[in-house]
Amino acid sequence: MIGKLKGVVDTLEEDHVILDVHGVGYLVHCSGRTLSALPRAGEAAALFIETHVREDQIRLFGFSSAAERDWFRLLQGIQGIGTKTALAVLSTLSASELTQAIALGDKTTVARAPGVGPRVATRIITELKDKMPGFSASEPLAAQLGGGGVASAQGGAAADAVSALVNLGYGVPQANAAIAAALRGAGEGAKTEVLIRLGLKELAK
């Protein structure tokens, strides 16, 4: 199984790239967002890979980040969503934007993707709100948060929730304040997903 490819961009097309890896050209299907982030032909590039094997073909799907690949996998687990729709969602929304939209229950944002109407958007939010990837704190981030605030005071779910907000681009003080407010509303036993959702609502005020 191929997990990642690193090579030189040979050809860029509307829905795929051909990546030259030591003389072998791999045709890799990508979201529009990933394709637009790739360098021009002749320059080095790397992609996280998801491999689909069928009786009559092998297809490679490439992503600029592991988070985007994880979302691709999750989206396909929903009834009625195939590779085309999953890539359309990821062409419209970045991994962090999709995470935020699902956490807030924002079906209007999710429905912006081609082929995703309100009904499918609602299904995406309902089925994935408790499966959102990328919420575990890394050691550097945990150390950064450890200096004070709600993350160090509460630990566990609160620390993971603060980490998730920081990963979405919010500052540490903002994230701490938002999760502190979430804890006041939900109580200390609240799960990480609940704290993230409430924290994002605080930040959206």
From Swiss-Prot:
GO MF: ATP binding; four-way junction DNA binding; four-way junction helicase activity
One biological process term in Gene Ontology: DNA repair
Gene3D superfamilies per the UniProt record, alphabetical: 5' to 3' exonuclease, C-terminal subdomain (1.10.150.20), DNA helicase RuvA subunit, C-terminal domain (1.10.8.10), Nucleic acid-binding proteins (2.40.50.140)
Chain residue ranges for the region called Domain III: 153-205
Region annotation Domain II: where it falls in the sequence: 65-143
Region (Flexible linker) residue spans: 144-152
Assigned keywords, A-Z: Cytoplasm, DNA damage, DNA recombination, DNA repair, DNA-binding
This protein's GO CC annotations: cytoplasm; Holliday junction helicase complex; Holliday junction resolvase complex
UniProt subcellular location: Cytoplasm
Region (Domain I): 1-64
Cysteine pairs bridged by disulfides in the record: none
SMART domains recorded: HhH1
Pfam families: HHH_5, RuvA_C, RuvA_N
InterPro entries to which the protein is assigned, alphabetical: DNA_helicase_Holl-junc_RuvA_I, Hlx-hairpin-Hlx_DNA-bd_motif, NA-bd_OB-fold, RuvA, RuvA_2-like, RuvA_C, RuvA_C_sf
Role noted for this protein: The RuvA-RuvB-RuvC complex processes Holliday junction (HJ) DNA during genetic recombination and DNA repair, while the RuvA-RuvB complex plays an important role in the rescue of blocked DNA replication forks via replication fork reversal (RFR). RuvA specifically binds to HJ cruciform DNA, conferring on it an open structure. The RuvB hexamer acts as an ATP-dependent pump, pulling dsDNA into and through the RuvAB complex. HJ branch migration allows RuvC to scan DNA until it finds its consensus sequence, where it cleaves and resolves the cruciform DNA.
Annotated domain remarks: Has three domains with a flexible linker between the domains II and III and assumes an 'L' shape. Domain III is highly mobile and contacts RuvB.
Quaternary structure (record): Homotetramer. Forms an RuvA(8)-RuvB(12)-Holliday junction (HJ) complex. HJ DNA is sandwiched between 2 RuvA tetramers; dsDNA enters through RuvA and exits via RuvB. An RuvB hexamer assembles on each DNA strand where it exits the tetramer. Each RuvB hexamer is contacted by two RuvA subunits (via domain III) on 2 adjacent RuvB subunits; this complex drives branch migration. In the full resolvosome a probable DNA-RuvA(4)-RuvB(12)-RuvC(2) complex forms which resolves the HJ.
Family (UniProt): Belongs to the RuvA family.
Protein name per its UniProtKB record: Holliday junction branch migration complex subunit RuvA
